[in-house]
């Protein structure tokens, strides 16, 4: 309950920001540039594998093929991404369940659009740790990116799946890979939730890690099967006013998703990851091998509902699939 209250407070703050931003932009009609291309402001995370399909769609000219030119608007947080979309400063944006679904639950007219990104999280401990099983985490300190965020929710789900009381551990905010590493080295935390890119980065610095569970290798149980980490979003108003633009965006992203899934593109994809993440060729290869099949161009209603319940609470029916997920993109 405390976690949900903390998160809802963040959502309320984000929605307040959105109300302020609404005066600065309009999401009703897409503009056209001098070349006749539709201009689309897209909210994005920079230097993050979560939006890799967007990177590839731009690099491969897939948006231009659909008559679209994108203006990337980078944000510092997922809450900011959702707020700027609602406020009209962007027309499409990557979203995370914790913010988008909560905003939908608060009555915001948002629509989820493909591609849908599989949850990429592992619960890891230092290689020399005596901890070898999730059950041994009872009473321990677990690192999460930030309190009340999806990484904490993931940890809670994994603990519960393994018979450990989620309230019986201490959650410690450790940030991303750069600040996560010293928290592990110093013993500030016994374990931490980390994405593939963070694990690869930390290992490259000489700190061995072992995964107790990992969504990318099937060891995370049910949450690894159905969990979503990202999807793309627009507003009902923009979709209704610009259906062809939304379809064009979605088609370009679907082509990018298929390009990434095809391992024949590994070398080119690695070069893109090197540039995106500022990592070595070797590390880019490790990341590619883990994540390149992480995105899907569709989602079933059952999977959507499971993510709603994981995010908003068991039994939640306030964000129905039919009203909030675009299924027309192929």
What residues fall within each predicted segment?
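Short, glycine-/small- and polar/acidic-enriched structural segments
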Residues: 30-165, 171-177, 190-196, 209-213
């Amino acid at each position: 309950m405390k976690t949900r209250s903390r998160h809802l407070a963040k959502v309320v703050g984000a929605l307040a920001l959105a109300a302020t931003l609404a005066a600065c932009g309009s999401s009703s009609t897409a503009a056209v540039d001098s070349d006749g291309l539709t201009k689309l402001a897209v909210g994005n995370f920079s230097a993050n594998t979560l939006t890799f399909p967007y990177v590839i769609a731009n690099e491969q000219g897939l948006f231009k093929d659909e008559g679209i030119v994108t203006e990337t608007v980078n944000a510092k947080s997922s809450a900011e991404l959702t707020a700027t979309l609602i406020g009209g400063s962007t027309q499409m944006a990557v979203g995370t369940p914790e913010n988008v679904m909560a905003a939908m639950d608060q009555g915001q007219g948002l629509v989820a659009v493909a591609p849908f990104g599989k949850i990429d999280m592992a619960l890891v401990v230092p290689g020399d740790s005596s901890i070898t099983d999730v059950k041994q985490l009872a009473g321990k300190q677990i690192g999460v990116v930030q309190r009340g965020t999806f990484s904490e929710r993931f940890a809670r789900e994994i603990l519960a799946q393994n018979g450990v009381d989620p309230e019986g551990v201490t959650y410690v905010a450790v940030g991303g890979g750069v600040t996560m590493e010293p928290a592990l080295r110093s013993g500030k935390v016994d374990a931490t939730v980390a994405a593939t890119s963070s694990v690869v980065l930390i290992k490259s610095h000489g700190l061995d890690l072992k995964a107790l569970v990992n969504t990318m290798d099937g060891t995370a149980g049910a949450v690894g099967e159905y969990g979503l980490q990202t999807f793309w979003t627009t507003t009902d108003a923009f979709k209704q006013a610009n259906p062809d633009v939304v379809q064009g965006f979605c088609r370009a992203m679907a082509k990018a998703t298929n390009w990434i899934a095809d391992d024949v593109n590994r070398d080119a994809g690695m070069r893109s990851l090197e540039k995106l993440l500022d990592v070595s060729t070797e590390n880019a290869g490790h990341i590619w091998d883990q994540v390149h099949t992480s995105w899907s161009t569709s989602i079933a209603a059952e999977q959507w509902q499971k993510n709603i319940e994981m995010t908003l609470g068991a039994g939640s029916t306030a964000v129905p699939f039919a009203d909030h997920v675009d299924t027309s993109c192929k």
